């Protein structure tokens, strides 16, 4: 006897995460800090370093380099417009059928920069990964905010001398 699995409804195949991050740093400083955090300064919420390579140009790769031609491909830069836009598409952390689109839009606002973040994924993502993605983005964005604000503070101190 053949069993047929019932396909999940489309609602269960779409994951949307949005965040608004307020940074007390100039637009350019915030954008560079974001690239650094997504790249060589990336780390897991438990503090373990997980450096990534982000080739910040259209078609550039975003991947974890484990050395000796080993690693994990996360995505491609779909669009970049310094310092206001970064879009990445790809499987990200998934080792199963899933495609994601990340969008970072940076907007200058009074006192600094606002980052509007959208992660839309299509595929069967289990609940543990949905929760982990939300927590991971929260942590990564908080680290980027701190990095930008620290950099802006150092630059301001240098100008004051």
Can you say where each PLM-predicted feature lies in the sequence?
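A generic structural micro-feature
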Residues: 11-13, 54, 69, 94-98, ...
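Short beta-edge strand/loop motif at the mouth of beta-sheet-based domains
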Residues: 18, 25, 36-73, 83-85, ...
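Hydrophobic/aromatic beta-strand elements that line small-molecule binding cavities or substrate pockets
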Residues: 19-21, 52, 74-79, 100-108
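A conserved amphipathic terminal alpha-helix motif
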Residues: 2-3, 121-161
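Short acidic N-proximal helix/loop "leader" segments that mark the beginning
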Residues: 1-18
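A short, structured loop/turn motif at beta-sheet edges
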Residues: 23-29, 78-84, 105-114
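Beta-strand/loop substructures that line and gate deep hydrophobic ligand-binding cavities in soluble
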Residues: 92-139
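Hydrophobic pocket/interface hotspot
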Residues: 30-34, 62, 77, 88, ...
